[in-house]
Amino acid sequence: IIVPDSAHGTNPASAAVCGLEIVQVKSNAMGLVDVEDLKPLLDDTIAGIMMTNPNTLGLFEKDIKEIAALVHACGGLLYYDGANMNPLMGMVRPGDMGFDVLHLNLHKTFSTPHGGGGPGAGPVGVAQHLVPYLPVPKVLEDVDGSLYVEGSGADDTCGRISGFMGNFAVLLRAYTYILTLGKQNIRMVGPLAVLGANYIKESLKDSFKLPIASVCKHEFVFDGLLDQSTGVTTLDVAKRLLDYGFHAPTIYFPLLFHQAIMIEPTETESKETLDGFIEIMKHIAEEALNDPESLKTAPHTTPVRRLDETTAARQPVLRYRDLA
């Protein structure tokens, strides 16, 4: 499986769990899949490529049709990680870009909590030519609009799988969200998210390092502070944000940049909230120059200060008392 170097780690991990070898394709200077680097990787041993579009840098892969043609020509499939469907809802169909299989991240695009206190749910969709391989049973619609259950399926079906419906409550929330917005309003989600992201990006590019200056979609990535002479890191900026009442954004991801700060405002934030965030980020950038220690020792107002996050991740304590 070919995976871009900008991809989320779950992409190569998922393929590896299935026993596939991971081959990485590089990004070009614009942060997009380098088509020339991709071409030598394509042969009859390739099962396919996993991509997100827009990609993890928030950039639309403009060469996606060419990439699809190249991968299909050697017998491979295109798998779409639906993490970034937010700016495309109601405007672009992944199948029209050439994708054969996709999953939708309901917590990223369709307003559901991240699992809702239980397992997550990621609906999987396939192009028509892969329908015979879907698991059974299947709920189908007859010509008269009635529904029926097909228990056996085609000879190529992968058969029955346990928990095939995932977390039903999460699916129901996503379905409710879609019905509530309706066809017209769901098309407004993307433009609002894109507008908010670009507004923040352009407002902060004189304070934070912007490695790729092109128009982004719903998210973008800074590479730390523009002036890094004081030694203030992305982690320091994230911790200081907590003192001002803002949840810290994703940091140190994607791995293409050493001091990555990923900012994704979504479509729901008001201009007042965006302006408040911009003001605080500019203030933090000034603090980094004039009082760097205030960032290096942040946060100052939270119940706990800096945790040993490495130990917490590797040796988690999941109970408040020892039950042994």
Residue ranges and their predicted role:
Residues 1-144, 231-232, 259:
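Conserved PLP-enzyme active-site core in the AAT-like
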Residues 4-8, 76-77, 176-179, 218-222:
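Short low-complexity stretches enriched in small and charged residues
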Residues 27, 104, 172-175, 204:
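A generic, residue-level signal for flexible/boundary positions that often mark functional hotspots
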Residues 54, 107, 111, 176-183, ...:
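A broad detector of the eukaryotic-type serine/threonine protein kinase catalytic domain
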Residues 81, 102, 126, 153-156, ...:
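Short, functionally important structural connectors and interaction interfaces within domains
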Residues 92, 142-164, 171, 178-324:
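Non-catalytic terminal extensions of PLP-dependent enzymes
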Residues 118-120, 163-168:
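FAD-binding core of FAD-dependent oxidoreductases
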